[in-house]
């Protein structure tokens, strides 16, 4: 059956059905089903979240000052960003302000997360969708060295270094214990890199394992631990004592100097490894511009990284805010989190129930009541689904919409909005990438563009960290050591009933928490996370979400090896892990693969 969606996609589910399940992430597990035509081109895509989060239910009647500690556990990869969003929601509801030092420290922690998440995502979750590890065994180490030195002056680029990496890789392969490289689609026709580029990428994959351990030390310095650092309504929980005396764990100059050193390291890694690798890989995939989906149509960002404490206006935010509709870069619409006409969640195709499912609810009025049922055209059972019925309920993810539109969120959305706003810090790097690769601006709206935007954002975040670190040190030297305001800490100072919203730009996209507080306790709590936007099912009018849209019209080299599906889905950074099964239309396993 062929369907034309309101947001401009033609769906045809009459072809062969391919099921990828489970594709897992921290918020839950993900399943993808596609229909391909006789030429193995994807003509229909169905994305579903197969696990109920339920944090909103857990939080009801709890102390709002503790909400951050619960919501932070939603995700163990983008650790801390839910906590920051939560404390901002409570502060917004109760009118609590934070000191300047707390604003700088929060920005440092959030930006450190951006860099950490982007680096780990690309090298350890996404790179192997572009890089053929086995091909690296046939590379010439001297030619690999020449390639590496032609794109960067990174010191680990000698022929001997790459020879050692190749030898280690060969022993690894010959041992039969492939670990993260097991069951890859090595040799698939969709791999385009020469052996030398593959060897260089494998070397940097290994280097990034060590590098990511250093970045998280910033969270342990300011937040006490990682993952899940500590946060505080009204500021940050770390006192400042530059003379080294006082509370255990207080921030002193030794620890501040360590943060400065880590920032210098991550800037160098971004400049000399991550961004050059993206450019090198991109140069071989210039003709693989699939996966754009909604990115060239509808994108959305809340904005984040406030310059000034307690100022979340668009002018204060370093990351851009706004919405673009129908691909019109000439107009960026303002975004208001509190406007019930702007943001609504639908459950027509989600395993929840509303009193009237033809209408969406603003998160302040949101309902999280599970209602698990399979549609009449589904195959299998509730505990063993063989094929979903996308005409009915088919996902544990709700369908958020901005003024009725399905939207893409994430680094690409942020950079498209910054580009459209003609902000030099976003537009100039994008223009340079496009010019160096010889690509038009429309190439930005693709899987490759989404991957490049994440690298550019990691680079941008490193320099912003240096800025806020210098700002923090200057403020401390000026005599300001405040890190928290606690004048409204006690519940007896709060209104009887109040509501608020907190927002951030998580590494994977716009994130917001809406809270209602009544009699000092949480009366209602709703989270709308990046994957809710990108992984949303269809809405009452038939609009498809960003994941589903991105897979449309993508050709597959081999349907039993869904490399192209994973390449595009991974580009959104849905924290994939565990194993994936590919099923034939009759439910029989065709192949088993390990997603890395």
From Swiss-Prot:
Domain of life assignment: Bacteria
Keyword Translocase included in the entry's annotation: no
Topology of this chain in the membrane: Peripheral membrane protein
Cell location: Cell membrane
First-tier enzyme category under EC: oxidoreductase
Catalytic activity: H2 + A = AH2
Annotated binding of Ni(2+), by residue: 75, 78, 575, 578
Enzyme Commission number: 1.12.99.6
A GO cellular-component term linked to this record: plasma membrane
Signal peptide: none
GO molecular function, one term: nickel cation binding
Subcellular location, principal: membrane
Function text: This enzyme recycles the H(2) produced by nitrogenase to increase the production of ATP and to protect nitrogenase against inhibition or damage by O(2) under carbon- or phosphate-limited conditions.
Oligomeric form and interacting partners: Heterodimer of a large and a small subunit.
Protein name: Uptake hydrogenase large subunit
Source organism of this protein record: Rhizobium leguminosarum bv. viciae
Gene: hupB
């Amino acid at each position: 059956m062929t369907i034309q969606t309101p947001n401009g996609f033609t769906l045809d589910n009459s072809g062969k059905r391919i099921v990828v399940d489970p594709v897992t992430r921290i918020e839950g597990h993900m399943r993808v089903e596609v229909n391909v035509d006789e030429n193995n081109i994807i003509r229909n895509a169905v994305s579903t979240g197969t696990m109920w989060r339920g944090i909103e239910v857990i939080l009801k009647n709890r102390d709002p000052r503790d909400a951050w500690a619960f919501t932070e556990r939603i995700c163990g990869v983008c650790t801390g960003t839910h906590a920051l969003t939560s404390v901002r929601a409570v502060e917004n509801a109760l009118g609590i302000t934070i000191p300047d030092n707390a604003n700088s420290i929060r920005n440092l922690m959030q930006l450190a997360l951006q860099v950490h998440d982007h680096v780990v995502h690309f090298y350890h979750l996404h790179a192997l969708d572009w890089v053929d590890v086995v091909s690296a065994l046939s590379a010439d180490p001297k030619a690999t060295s020449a390639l590496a030195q032609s794109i960067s002056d990174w010191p680990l680029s000698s022929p001997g270094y790459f020879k050692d990496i190749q030898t280690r890789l060969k022993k690894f392969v010959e041992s039969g214990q492939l670990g993260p490289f097991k069951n890859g689609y090595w040799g698939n026709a969709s791999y385009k890199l020469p052996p030398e580029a593959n060897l260089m990428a494998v070397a940097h994959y290994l280097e990034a394992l060590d590098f990511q351990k250093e970045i998280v030390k910033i969270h342990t310095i300011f937040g006490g631990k990682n993952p899940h650092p500590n946060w505080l309504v009204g500021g940050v929980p770390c006192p400042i004592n530059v003379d080294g005396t006082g509370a255990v764990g207080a921030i002193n100059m030794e620890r501040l100097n360590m943060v400065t050193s880590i920032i210098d390291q991550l800037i160098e890694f971004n400049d000399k490894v991550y961004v050059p690798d993206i450019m090198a890989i991109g140069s071989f995939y210039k003709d693989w511009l699939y996966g754009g989906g909604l990115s060239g149509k509808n994108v959305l960002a809340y904005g984040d990284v406030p310059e000034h404490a307690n100022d979340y206006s668009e002018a204060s935010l370093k990351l851009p805010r706004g919405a673009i509709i129908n691909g019109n870069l000439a107009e960026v619409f303002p975004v208001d989190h509190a406007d019930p006409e702007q943001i609504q969640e639908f459950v027509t195709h989600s395993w929840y129930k509303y009193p009237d499912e033809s209408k969406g609810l603003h998160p302040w009025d949101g309902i999280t009541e599970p209602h698990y049922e399979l549609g009449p055209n589904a195959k299998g059972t509730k505990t063993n689904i063989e094929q979903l019925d996308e005409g009915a309920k088919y996902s544990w993810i709700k369908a958020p919409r901005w003024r009725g539109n399905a939207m893409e969120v994430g680094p690409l959305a942020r950079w498209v909005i910054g580009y459209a706003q003609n902000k030099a810090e976003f537009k100039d790097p994008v223009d340079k990438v496009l010019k160096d690769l010889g690509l038009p601006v429309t190439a930005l709206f693709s899987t490759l563009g989404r991957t490049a935007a994440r690298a550019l954002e990691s680079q941008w975040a490193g320099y912003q960290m240096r800025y806020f670190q210098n700002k923090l040190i200057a403020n401390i030297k000026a005599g300001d050591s405040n890190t928290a305001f606690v004048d409204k800490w006690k519940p007896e100072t709060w209104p009887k009933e109040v509501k608020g919203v907190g927002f951030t730009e998580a590494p994977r996209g716009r994130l917001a928490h809406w809270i209602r507080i009544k009699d000092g306790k949480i009366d209602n709590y709703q989270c709308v996370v990046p994957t809710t936007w990108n992984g949303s099912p269809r809405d009452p009018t038939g609009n498809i979400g960003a994941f589903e849209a991105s897979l449309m019209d993508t050709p597959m080299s081999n349907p039993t090896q869904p490399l192209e599906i994973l390449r595009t889905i991974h580009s959104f950074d849905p924290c994939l892990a565990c194993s994936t099964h590919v099923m034939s239309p009759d439910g029989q396993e065709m192949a088993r693969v390990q997603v890395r």
